[in-house]
Regions:
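Short, charged juxtamembrane terminal tails flanking transmembrane helices
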Residues: 206-210
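Membrane-embedded alpha-helical bundles of multi-pass transporters/translocases
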Residues: 1-22, 27, 34-136, 140-204
Length: 210
């Protein structure tokens, strides 16, 4: 589970790295400054949390409760959808690497820039994924950890988050050197592989929690 968390935060926290660069370089910011997009995630957290908790509660009352390991796997899939959307969009637009794009004439850059709705869709998927993974994952670790190791396991969760953040520098390297769709495709693959690993452990993890 901690390994999954590393790759989730490595992908999710690109919102402060390559996704912010994408907002600066490839999105028309004439109406909205790139830094404003940092507020979209907190906004979605506030709006979507009650809705998602209501859905979980509804399923539980119907006897169809989704286990926490399955929720984490679903969260990785949803995060993958965000990068799938970006990869397909960037491929359809024919975006080159960021370094190549910034070398184009200004008029050509402006004509190719995306509308702000692209970021809205991306952050929506990433925020939903965060709500499936971040609070539920920490709760799961606290639940399955031996009482004598509870503090250690919670610390390992935070260490996994920190390690994911330490890997963030890889995103800008790909963003600047590769066609943009390839950059997003790497994060898509990371999310889908993590989902597959989690699904492979689901039954075992569900037995552990019973």
């Amino acid at each position: 589970v901690l390994g999954i968390v590393i790759f989730f935060w490595f992908s999710f926290h690109q919102n402060g790295m390559s996704l912010s660069f994408f907002a600066r370089d490839f999105v028309d910011s004439s109406a909205v400054a790139p830094e404003v997009w940092q507020a979209i995630n907190p906004f979605f957290v506030i709006v979507l949390t009650p809705m998602i908790m209501a859905i979980f509660g509804f399923l539980a009352r119907r006897g169809r409760e989704i286990s926490t390991p399955r929720k984490i796997a679903i969260g990785m899939f949803i995060a993958g959808l965000a990068f799938l959307f970006l990869a397909v969009f960037s491929m359809m637009k024919g975006y080159p690497s960021a370094d190549t794009f910034k070398g184009l004439p200004i008029a050509e850059q402006m004509a190719a820039k995306a509308h702000w709705w692209v970021l809205i869709v991306t952050y929506f998927f990433l925020t939903v994924a965060e709500l499936f993974i971040s609070p539920l994952g920490l709760s799961f670790v606290s639940k399955v950890a031996p009482k004598s190791m509870l503090g250690l396991c919670q610390g390992l969760w935070l260490a996994a988050t920190a390690l994911g953040n330490l890997l963030l520098w890889i995103g800008p390297l790909m963003y600047n050197a590769w066609p943009i769709w390839q950059c997003w495709s790497v994060f898509l693959i990371v999310c889908l592989v993590s989902m597959g690993v989690m699904l492979g452990m689901v039954k075992w993890l569900e037995r552990v929690t019973k």
